[in-house]
Design a protein with these regions (language model features):
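Intrinsically disordered, low-complexity regulatory segments
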Residues: 1-465
Length: 465
């Protein structure tokens, strides 16, 4: 018995298929089954392209994340919790191969299991679980302070060798392919179900895309902008939620309308904090960023993306998501310009912003101010520091025109820009330091004439003859 079937639009056909193929189907069941099978075939053909395109965008945003040093020296990290919402992957797997950002102390006897700066290998990961440790602070790509790329300590193990990652490994491309490739697998797996109603994976892939592009989700749930007491008023169309904070002067009040069909997650007279989810549905990462800050927004995106993959039994290490999110979060938006030549509302990388401010401060001027933002992968690629990489991705004419007008220079730190101009890419597979490939003269500027002179071209032509 095949059960309920999806029609070509993805809606459920109300009458299920009760017969089996041995006994034979009725006319209605046969037509419904054929439509379901056709949907499966067309889905796998069309949606494979979507998964491939997602991989391309992920590679484009992260190709310049390469291991550039052994240790950046940062003291910060991220906290990995044993009980982490709806995560199904074991605690052991989430801390294995990471570097501890602070001492991990046993809950039983207060002994130090892992010292700060040590790798959490198999025996230590087991000891952490046995000693009832509920949270571990580990180094992360999100908190690495390397100017370009990331350091080996913040990345941790390369799981192909089960030891610390070598210098020069292109971890950005590895992360993009680790996330994108299962997307292709998921999409192609739809065909095997032949339109039978179940958790259709093609609903999962658009969800991952939605998260990485920082889009406002369709099934949006409001979050409280302020802390305060909830008052719920039922109307004909839905619920009117009021959050009031009477402790401040003047008192604050926010109103939210929630449709009747949506399940509420708070009760009348509940006290909520800023950022509390008020109803069932997805949150907008931009709201979390505004209310709770960049760290909470990053945690939400990782948790939601992992939920999609883990529901299909696909295990992807968190560090791959962290590498992509590092690139999504490396821009700032200019608020005040000071004595710089920047424009309010411009997007600029943190590295470039700090360089410009340092130069202005050295001259005794007033620095610019900015706030950190999180961009979707497409937008982040287009606002890359490398105009060669951005132009080879999308909107080529626009990117090149702006690069010429601003006299931008390209430091050639990523893979794409070096491939385009025919140089060696700044990576190494055997642990050799790729820094020699990143010398200061390797800067390609749109403001200078880099074309060969006429005599050298004529000489080359005569040599070929």
């Amino acid at each position: 018995m095949r059960g309920l079937i999806l029609d070509p639009l993805g809606k459920i056909v109300e009458l299920p298929i009760k017969s089996n193929f041995r006994e034979g189907l009725s006319i209605f069941e046969y037509v419904a089954s054929a439509r379901g099978s056709r949907k499966g075939l067309t889905d796998s053909a069309l949606k494979t392209a979507n998964a491939g395109y997602l991989t391309r965008r992920l590679v484009d945003v992260s190709h310049d994340v390469i291991i550039r040093g052994e240790d950046c020296g940062t003291k910060s990290g991220i906290i990995v919790f044993k009980e982490d919402g709806e995560r199904t992957s074991p605690f052991h797997d989430r801390i294995l191969g990471r570097v501890a950002a602070s001492n991990v102390v046993s809950k039983k006897n207060k002994k130090v299991i892992v010292k700060e700066g040590e790798e959490i290998e198999e025996t230590k990961a087991k000891a952490i679980e046995e000693n009832e440790v509920t949270e571990v602070t580990v180094r992360s790509a999100l908190t690495c302070v390397m100017e370009y790329g990331i350091c080996a300590a913040c990345y941790g193990w390369d799981f192909s060798t089960k030891r610390r990652v070598n210098l020069g490994v292109p971890v950005g491309v590895m992360a993009a392919q680790s996330i994108g490739e299962p997307g292709t697998q998921l999409t192609m797996r739809v065909r095997h179900f032949g339109g039978v109603v179940m958790s259709d994976v093609t609903q999962g892939l658009p969800r991952v895309e939605e998260l990485f592009e920082m889009r406002t989700p369709k099934n949006l749930s409001p979050v409280s902008d302020i802390s305060g007491k909830v008052e719920i008023e039922k109307t004909d169309d839905g619920y009117l939620l009021k959050v009031k904070n009477l402790r401040v002067k003047p008192p604050e009040e926010r109103e939210y309308f929630i449709p009747l069909a949506t399940e509420l997650m708070v009760h009348d007279q509940d006290v909520v904090s800023a950022g509390t989810q008020l109803a069932q549905g997805y949150l907008d990462p931009k709201d979390i960023l505004k209310i709770k800050g960049i760290v909470e927004a990053q945690k939400y995106i990782i948790a939601e993306a992992q939920k999609v993959y883990e529901s299909q039994g696909i295990g992807i290490n968190d560090k791959h998501f962290e590498v992509i999110l590092r690139k999504m979060s490396d821009k700032v938006i200019i608020e005040t310009v000071g004595d710089t030549a920047l424009i309010p509302g411009d997007f600029i990388t943190k590295v470039k912003f700090e360089e410009i401010n340092a130069e202005i401060l050295s001259q005794g001027g007033e620095p610019a101010t900015a706030r950190q933002i999180q961009l979707g992968i497409t937008k982040s690629s287009l606002f890359s520091d490398s105009w060669l990489s951005a132009a080879s991705f999308q909107e080529t004419t626009k990117v090149l025109t702006e690069a010429v007008l601003q006299g931008q220079e390209d430091r050639l730190v990523g893979l794409k820009e070096n491939v385009i101009i025919g140089r060696l890419i700044p990576v190494s597979s055997d642990g050799e330091d790729p820094q020699e490939l990143l010398q200061s003269e390797r800067v390609l500027s749109t403001g200078t004439d880099t074309s060969p002179d006429k005599t050298s071209i004529e000489q080359q032509a005569s040599d070929n003859v």
